[in-house]
Amino acid sequence: MTLSSAGGSRSHRHNGGHSERDVEIRILKDKVRSLTKEKISLQKELEYYKNEITKLLSPPYIEAVVLEVIDDNRVVVKSSTGPNLIVNVAAGVDARSLKPGAIVALNNRGSTIVDVLPGRYDPLVKAMEVEERPKVFFKDVGGLEEQIREIYEAVVLPIKNPHLFRELGIDPPKGVLLHGPPGTGKTLLAKAVAGETEATFIRVVGSELVNKFIGEGARLVREIFRLAREKAPSILFIDEIDAIASKRVDIGTSGDREVQRTMLQLLAELDGFDPLDNVKVIAATNRLDLIDPAVLRPGRFDRIIEVPLPSLRGRLEILGIHTRKAKMAPDVDLEAIAKLTEGFSGADLKAVVVEAGYNAIRRGSRVITMDDMIKAVEKVKAALDKRGGGDPFIRAQQKSGDDTIATVI
């Protein structure tokens, strides 16, 4: 073997060794990178479980409501355990968020505010009907020209043109009370007001505010008015207000006293806001004679509007509204139908049009005829007979309508 060939062999082995070591180094580096990533992931997971253990072992906080802010470091709160407390404010809590009514968390000893909790509403309040922008306007309400004028002046005008009242130096009504028989359009009027003012429509039924627990009804009233202010401009419509605003009696059960507390909270809320605010209260009842006089005094529900059963002209307008989109045969005489329906409410007239549509469907037709309308009037009137019972006024109106139907037939 020559010297040159021996040197070449050693050089080849030396280069081959370098190549193998380079591969091993690359593999080891890849393993290091992989293990480093795994270590970071495991560290994050460890921190997560440490935090979870800390949460599980940490004592619970006490919920409280701020009553008064004394200074940046001391606040009066009402704790969920009962008593009012003067507590300190932890360093990390923003003092600007501590306002009367704010919900806060106290430490387990109840001596320090450690956090300000987000505001919330009772589930009953959130479940109430809230319609952001109702698609109902005054043109959709028939036979109530005088009532529309009164409610426009009392509610719509102060919201749209408050400067008129400021210039005159007068206050518009804070609340409007609608009263009249069922189905005459009280809720429809309230929705039309919300539609005309582009306001949020909040509908509350009085019976929902009657609660068996002491203080619950009053708390619900406070939360409803708070929701109305946050959604302003808003129309707060309280239906069946007689459930919480009936006349007070000296002798009553604990349930009666709770209803009275709810009514007093309602009066306090009405007394507490500016008449020119963008929150207007409209209430409705079928029994004005049951309402407590304190509710009706000036400064509260001081505009009382009767919504009666529609007149002949009103019934004709209502029928025109409900048949606006219906396919009617040329022989349908709405004026004759209006004469047949004396004593009918707006809801009854809508039921007549719907029932006439069903009559047409049963015949296999797609057009409503006069005969369909007359049969529908008879069916709705029969239902009114059962519903009217022994009321002599309703019976007299129905008898008059029966005589008219007999004449037409």
From Swiss-Prot:
Consists of three main regions, an N-terminal coiled-coil domain that may assist in substrate recognition, an interdomain involved in PAN hexamerization, and a C-terminal ATPase domain of the AAA type. GO terms for molecular function: ATP binding; ATP hydrolysis activity. ATP binds at residues 183-188, 322. PANTHER family: 26S PROTEASOME REGULATORY SUBUNIT. InterPro entries: 26S_Proteasome_ATPase (IPR050221), AAA+_ATPase (IPR003593), AAA_lid_3 (IPR041569), ATPase_AAA_core (IPR003959), ATPase_AAA_CS (IPR003960), NA-bd_OB-fold (IPR012340), Nucleotidase_PAN (IPR023501), P-loop_NTPase (IPR027417). GO terms for cellular component: cytoplasm; proteasome-activating nucleotidase complex. SMART domains: AAA. Disulfide bonds: none annotated. This is Proteasome-activating nucleotidase. It comes from the Archaea. Keywords: ATP-binding, Chaperone, Coiled coil, Cytoplasm, Nucleotide-binding, Proteasome. HAMAP family: PAN. Residues 23-58 form a coiled coil. The gene is pan. Its main location: cytoplasm. Residues 1-22 are annotated as: Disordered. Homohexamer. The hexameric complex has a two-ring architecture resembling a top hat that caps the 20S proteasome core at one or both ends. Upon ATP-binding, the C-terminus of PAN interacts with the alpha-rings of the proteasome core by binding to the intersubunit pockets. GO terms for biological process: proteasomal protein catabolic process; protein unfolding. The keyword Chaperone applies. PROSITE patterns: AAA. It is found in: Cytoplasm. ATPase which is responsible for recognizing, binding, unfolding and translocation of substrate proteins into the archaeal 20S proteasome core particle. Is essential for opening the gate of the 20S proteasome via an interaction with its C-terminus, thereby allowing substrate entry and access to the site of proteolysis. Thus, the C-termini of the proteasomal ATPase function like a 'key in a lock' to induce gate opening and therefore regulate proteolysis. Belongs to the AAA ATPase family.
